[in-house]
Amino acid sequence: MAKINDHYLKLKAGYLFPEIGRRVREFAAANPSAKVIRLGIGDVTRPLAPAVIKAFHEAVDDLATTENFAGYGPEQGYDWLINAIIEKSYKPLGVDLKTEEMFISDGSKCDCANILDIFALDNVVAIGDPVYPVYNDTNVMIGRTGEADDKGYYKGIVYMPCTEENGFIPSLPTEKVDIIYLCFPNNPTGTVATKAELKKWVDYAIANDAVIFFDAAYEAFITDPAIPHSIYEIEGAKKCAIEFRSFSKTAGFTGVRCGLVVVPEEVMGTTPTGEKYSFNKLWLRRTTTKFNGASYPVQKAAAAVYSDEGWQQNKEIIDYYMENARIIREGLAAAGLTVYGGVNAPYIWLKTPGGMSSWDFFDKLLNECNVVGTPGSGFGPSGEGFFRLSAFGHRENVIEAVERIKKNLK
């Protein structure tokens, strides 16, 4: 009989968001007349920008003609999309990238998992706590860890607590690690990192021959000009960092699927015999073997994001969500809750009232306010006692949800 990958059996219960979905479905079945407002999972609600829709239609029309038909494209992505991203999103930051250093994908969630293919299992990994669950769970799945302890920490992973005391910015590891996951603006805490803070991590990585996985999925929500959008704004980062970006929140592509990875040619690893080798070459080899490229219509739509018209239209959509974030943040603060995030990020990280557990507060909001959020403990042990709300809802629902919560907490 075929054997399973038993590392999957180490995973704790279900993935966070399916568990939330299960509880909400049970509540809805028992309370069919209740109007449930979902501010939990970070799915967007605004339609795609008109320029993006126009490009989508044109790309579909291309596929209907012999002259413009597009079959298999380059696995790494079309140059016209890669160059548009570099020109519009990186060069204004003072970051110069080669076309060969960027890879277009079908989403950054997959990229954050698949990048592990090109790293040896005996690398020591450091992740924040709380953290986007994909970072943790994918390392468990591939066999890098032992079993989880009573707190939920897996043997073989270095956890870096992100707490109120350290401003939700992890401290440098005291032990040597090989791979460091950083996410800024942060999911789930909504925290951002300054250039000075990121410089510490870059310096650590260079000094310890480590590689930083920098998740910049929410960089488009940064409004403070002093906050870096890319790890490559930091001197030396191209020697030690791989950056992930997503179109899901930047352009509303949660149902379209498109992302990108930047793997600079300078980021090096070592072979078992100690020879240096470029991770860029390995990722290209992995990509050409396991991926046929994002679809032609999707890449055409993504390119429209970087047109002048598409850029402005998407900015207006992002501004809409950030106004939602302001409404949530200020409304809950006025209700006496301690809140973080929601300024340069679309997530609000709040402290549960009265020392309530994260899941108890989830049940309280669902049952008493008919509002769905995300329990902080689902992101890791250090998230216990906290709760995440998303700014991606419809404006009227956001306003109503805040009013319900304020009324309930009086």
Curated annotation (Swiss-Prot):
Pathway: Amino-acid biosynthesis; L-lysine biosynthesis via DAP pathway; LL-2,6-diaminopimelate from (S)-tetrahydrodipicolinate (aminotransferase route): step 1/1. It comes from the Bacteria. SUPFAM superfamilies: PLP-dependent transferases. One of its GO terms (biological process) is lysine biosynthetic process via diaminopimelate. One of its GO terms (molecular function) is pyridoxal phosphate binding. PANTHER family: AMINOTRANSFERASE. This is LL-diaminopimelate aminotransferase. It comes from Geobacter sulfurreducens (strain ATCC 51573 / DSM 12127 / PCA).
